[in-house]
Regions:
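Short S/T/G/P-rich N-terminal loop/turn motif that feeds into the first structured element of a domain
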Residues: 1-51, 55-69, 76-93
Length: 93
């Protein structure tokens, strides 16, 4: 069953977000990683949020092991554990 994951960083700016994306390539981390169906970054600068849709919790957790060192290096802090919800339905165009 698919999952919606919502991250609420405490200090996410466009510059930090863009740097984290650049560092994925530098670290050899594929984007999108296996199991990630959708990634959306939204909000106002300094208060950006990220939501994702994942195929499974195992795939999310595997990516998290690669992601957390990148976020730490860039200075992105999370306000706690992400919110995780089971998907009831997805409609795509």
């Amino acid at each position: 069953m698919s999952l919606v994951v919502r991250f609420s960083p405490t200090n996410l700016t466009a510059e930090k977000y863009d740097e984290s994306i650049r560092r994925h390539a530098e670290a050899g981390v594929a984007l999108p990683p296996d199991g990630m169906d959708l990634h959306v970054c939204f909000g106002s600068n300094g208060n950006l949020r990220v939501s994702e849709i994942w195929d499974s919790r195992d795939q999310l957790d595997a990516y998290g092991q690669q992601l957390m060192p990148i976020l730490a290096d860039v200075g992105i802090e999370l306000s706690g554990e992400p919110e995780i919800f089971e998907v009831h339905n997805i409609i795509k165009r």
